[in-house]
Every structure is written in C-alpha cells, then in structure tokens.
Amino acid sequence: MTFFGPKVLLLLTALIMSSGRTPLGVSGQRGDDVTTVTSETFTEDPNLVNDPATDETVLADIQPSTDDLASLNDKNTTTECRDEKFACTRLYSVHRPIKQCLHQICFTSSRRMYVINNEICSRLVCKEHEAMKDELCRQKAGLPPRRLRRSNYFRLPPCDNVNLQGPSGL
C-alpha cells in the first residue's frame, strides 16, 4: 500500500500534465488563444438564415410601439418631474502606501489619508412626491392636512406615538 503514497500521485500528475494530455473535463485555454465559436443552425429549413444580427436590424427590432410612447407622454405630463442637481461631497478614508528611506534602507508603510470627492449628483423630483413630503411634515408638526384646514378638522398625526395622558409627576 505504500506504492500509492502522495509522492507517487504527485509524480503521476506531473507526468500527465507534461505529456500534453489533459484529464477529462479540463481544458487548457488561456485568454489569448480563445477561438470564436460559430453558432449552429438547429433548423433544417433552408429559407431561414442564421446570420448574426447587424446594428440596423437590432435597432429596427427595438423601436417602441405607439402605445408605449403614449403612456410615457401621459406619465410625464401628469407627474411634472424635474431633474434636480445638488452637490454631494463625500469624504473617503483610504490607505496609501508611503515609501520612507533612511540612508540606504527603504521601507513602505500604509497610512490613512482622507480624500474629498467633490461630485455633482442628480435626482428626479416630482411634484407629487414634494406634496406628500410636505403633508408628512405638517402631520409631524401636529397641523391639520391642507385640504381639510378650513373645515376646523383636526386629527392627531398617525406617524407619531402620542401619549394622551401626559407626563406623570412621579
């Protein structure tokens, strides 16, 4: 049983790999010698052509229908959205390698540095969302909703847990 030790298995593996034969299921491809694979035709009908799609045919297939365009136009007119740009400056903490030399001995250490990234971000702001945010702020402040303001209707805000008993003196 000592014949099948780890040294013999390692030797057999080296012999198989050096002989140019590869075990089943292993392909010896590198990134630079990959060949292109042609697609096979799975139909026997000679009228069907299996040519790769060109840019014109792909773009012709993707054109939206008139129903899609109408729904997009309706959506844009009802929501009244705008693209709002704002500054979103971020502070990043990174480790940068610093090379320090004393006479002829050099060593590299990594120090934490802070990088400020000034960016301009954009977000889509819709009129409906702004109205909903205003309504939530009014409710949190304890004010009545705008549509019921003149009818002397007052309700407690549903967002907050309001203690109706008040603080106890104990």
Swiss-Prot record:
A motif (Cell attachment site) lies at residues 30-32. Residues 1-20 form the signal peptide. It is found in: Secreted, Extracellular space, Extracellular matrix. Keywords: Disulfide bond, Extracellular matrix, Glycoprotein, Secreted, Signal. Glycans are attached at N76. Its main location: secreted. GO terms for biological process: definitive hemopoiesis; embryonic eye morphogenesis. Forms intermolecular disulfide bonds either with other MAGP-2 molecules or with other components of the microfibrils. It comes from the Eukaryota. Associated with fibrillin-containing microfibrils of the developing nuchal ligament. GO terms for cellular component: extracellular region; microfibril. Pfam families: MAGP. Belongs to the MFAP family. May play a role in hematopoiesis. In the cardiovascular system, could regulate growth factors or participate in cell signaling in maintaining large vessel integrity. Component of the elastin-associated microfibrils. PANTHER family: MICROFIBRILLAR-ASSOCIATED PROTEIN 2 (PTHR16485), MICROFIBRILLAR-ASSOCIATED PROTEIN 5 (PTHR16485:SF6). Interacts with TGFB2. Interacts with BMP2. Interacts with FBN1 (via N-terminal domain) and FBN2. This is Microfibrillar-associated protein 5. It comes from Bos taurus (Bovine).
